[in-house]
Amino acid sequence: GLLLEKDSGERRLDDLRLYFLSYRSHSNQNRLILGNYRLEVAQGLIFNSPYGYSKGSDPIFPARQRERALLEYTIVDENASLCGVAGQFCFKIYQFFLFLSNTQRDASLNDDGTVKNFYTSGYHRNDLEMNKKDKLNERLIGGRVLIKPIPNLSLGTTFYRSIFDPVAAIQDEDLHRFSFAGKTNELIGLDYNFIHRQFNLFGEIARSRNNGFGVLSGVLMESKLLSFIVLGRRYSKDFHSFYGNSFSESGDNPQNESGIYTGFQLKPINNLKIKIYFDQFEFPWPTYRIPMPSSGKDMLFRTEYKLTKNLLFSLQYKFEQKDQFNSLFEQVIPRDKRNLRIQLDFQPSSLLRLRCRGEKNWIKYHYPQLLKSRYPHNFQGVLLYQDASLTMHPNFDIAARLTFFDTDNYESRLYQFEHDIPGMLTNQMLDGIGTRNYIRIQWSIKNFLSLSLKYATTHSYPNFPDERRSYRDLEKRIHSINVQLETNW
């Protein structure tokens, strides 16, 4: 496989170049990959997809990760790929993984040539960003052993050692006091998965070279009427896992977070599902958003009712309370966010799917009483969209969406996941007043060749324009096109 990608504003059409050669045995158990690859093992503390799994409408699935082992790297995140050789070998109750990698990473350098920080956005649009490209070399060697002594029990251990050149400098600021520094990082972890009837016990614990640790453990129960999961997590402030992306509130590498998550799914009658989750979390050390310890909680209630064979109605309410730092007052202000979503899914035939969604959110800042009258603290936003997916032929399908949005400001912005070309995940942010439309086409030209294309346009104005400027000056029109040609042999 070969993947070339260029972000908007970048000069080179092949700013990102990825390639791989993959071999699978007839049993599909033994694998060998040369080139770019990734690993998804255990609960993701050491290796996982860069996108991970975030909380959503399903309260069970995101909290219990399924091991996908060794995979070709076919996504466009520019900082999560390993490049070299990797193999997966199975022998009865044992599985062995061996991997080597030599990759170039983006980084900002100090005047003395040491690494100031890792640059992870992947953008190389100007000289400043280009000067960060491929400044850091990482050599990595590691392995994994998985044993299944009995059919319902698996035990695993994962380890790797990476060497960086140049070295990462020690930083004095409180925010970066526990950031990675030095030339070498090592991780070793243990994981388990035990299934007994309807119950599943699972977890993973890992330690980095500087004795920072991460631990994740949970229990899952599944039945026809009720499923529930309880998951605890704790990631120390000095835990360094650059390829890890386990369950967390931050959605980043597991570090500086602890919390407990509980999720339920009930099916009281055939056509009705009720889904609930609650998550309480805290960040014991300052983060880049808040220069002091902070905490929060969120909950979701969702009901899905199948009105007819082809018509599904869903209602979702989500509440989130998180600490926010106000630089003007230099204090933490609690922020409440409430979101209500109503959705209809209609599938008149196996070829056509329609979706209509209405969504509204409310934002409230809990300022001290003396400040409430002086500063706005309530904001709202609303979104409406119509979505259609049409399969005109087994090898050809079209997806299109028309979206209207109206938000008070950036604080009340809304997001929507969109269909995109394979390997890309789009969670589009919308603020102001306007529309966003797109069309995506996927065409399997031959068994070994496929074409994907997406065209999108956004037209918007700010809700509170500057009186000194006209709407024409404030108008935003953004057009984008993504094209991907994929071949397999």
Can you annotate each of these PLM segments?
Residues 1-2, 32, 60, 153-155, ...:
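Transmembrane beta-strand segments of Gram-negative outer membrane beta-barrel proteins
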Residues 3, 33, 86-88, 99, ...:
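Ordered hydrophobic segments in well-structured contexts
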Residues 3-18, 72-78, 131-134, 206-208, ...:
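Outer-membrane beta-barrel proteins
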Residues 9-69, 74-106, 226-240, 395-410:
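Outer membrane beta-barrel
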Residues 18, 80, 138, 143-170, ...:
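Exposed, low-structure sequence patches enriched in small/polar residues
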Residues 44-48, 110-112, 169-171, 241-243:
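Short acidic, glycine/serine/threonine-rich loops at helix termini
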Residues 53-65, 110-127, 420-424:
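Surface-exposed loop/turn segments flanking beta-strands in extracellular/periplasmic regions
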Residues 81-126, 133-146:
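Aromatic- and glycine-enriched pocket-lining scaffold segments that form the walls
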